[in-house]
Curated annotation (Swiss-Prot):
Protein function: Involved in the regulation of the intracellular balance of NAD and NADP, and is a key enzyme in the biosynthesis of NADP. Catalyzes specifically the phosphorylation on 2'-hydroxyl of the adenosine moiety of NAD to yield NADP.
Keyword NADP: yes
Membrane-crossing segments per the record: none
Catalysed reaction equations from the record: NAD(+) + ATP = ADP + NADP(+) + H(+)
Name used for this protein in its record: NAD kinase
Enzyme Commission identifier(s): 2.7.1.23
Organism this protein belongs to: Shouchella clausii (strain KSM-K16) (Alkalihalobacillus clausii)
Gene name tied to this protein: nadK
Family membership noted in the UniProt record: Belongs to the NAD kinase family.
GO molecular function, one term: metal ion binding
Residue numbers binding NAD(+): 45-46, 123-124, 149, 151, 186, 226
Length: 267
């Protein structure tokens, strides 16, 4: 089996990465940062997201497992004190694959001047105006649903529903529900302008299309990473459940709701 490790960059994470690499090489596993079968992240969710995007082009061949040394560890199954146990499992135990849905984001430009850009998000994608309010038509399955006016919109995956979406008052969804959630950022609602004012949950076969109506520059993010878009020329942003899925290497049960409880409720 081929592996690679990704570190948060602090002293503890780097030391754990060195230990993992040394032990796995001694067990005749091959280190391959180009085509790994398993990616071991040591850090927080930021480290995990960076690793995910580094290998988003080979999700069918690569599985991920994380050790939590950062601030947030929603995607990490292990803590530093369990590193030796994880190493032993990787060497000796076939892992179970658990798959989570992803978000597909396609950005198109006015007049077809540039090629559409396709991205995958593990947590969410956001669109915000960099000057004034964002005004866009929201279409669902090709039908106009509403005209949004406000600071921006957040489109999240079920696992990403625990991140920015939660801060916006969105619901937490179990990853077995292949869906996307659309949440508003400071929408304008008065006797002239109306939006639903509530998060929307769309099933796998529904596509959501955002058509920009006002001539403003926008900022698009994928998992909080700024996307290099030509901000002044964005025409539409299409989101739906992606065909690809992220694959987690599970060596022991870690139910989703237990993960939610430990992240947000347990002291």
């Amino acid at each position: 089996m081929k592996f690679t490790v990704a570190s948060r960059g602090d002293t503890l994470s780097d030391e754990l990465c060195d230990t993992i690499k040394t032990r796995l090489l001694a067990a005749d596993l091959a280190h391959d940062s180009d085509k790994p079968d398993i990616v071991i992240t040591v850090g927080g969710d930021g480290t995990f997201l960076e690793a995910f995007h580094s290998y988003a082009h080979r999700l069918e061949e690569t599985a991920f497992v994380g050790i939590h040394t950062g601030h947030l560890g929603f995607y990490a199954d292990w803590v530093p004190e369990e590193t030796e146990h994880l190493i032993t499992h990787i060497i000796k135990t076939p892992f179970q694959i658990v798959e989570y849905p992803l978000l597909e984001v396609v950005i198109r430009y006015r007049g077809g001047q540039r090629e559409p850009r396709r991205h995958l998000a593990l947590n969410e994608s956001t669109i915000k105006s960099t000057e004034g309010s964002l005004v866009c038509t929201v279409e669902i399955k090709g039908e106009a649903f509403e005209t949004f006016r406000g600071d921006g919109l957040c489109m999240s995956t079920p696992s990403g529903s625990t991140a920015y979406n939660k801060a916006l008052g969105g619901a937490i969804l179990h990853p077995s529900l292949a869906s996307i959630q659309l949440s508003e950022m400071a929408s304008i609602n008065n006797r002239i302008y109306r939006t639903l004012g509530s998060p929307l949950v769309l099933p796998q076969h529904h596509t959501c299309l955002l058509k920009l109506l006002n001539d403003v520059s926008v900022q698009v993010t994928i998992d909080h990473f700024n996307v290099p878009v030509f901000a002044e020329n964005v025409d539409t942003i299409q989101v739906r459940v992606a065909e690809e899925k992220v694959r987690f290497a599970r060596f022991r049960p870690f139910p989703f709701w237990k993960r939610v409880k430990e992240a947000f409720i347990s002291e």
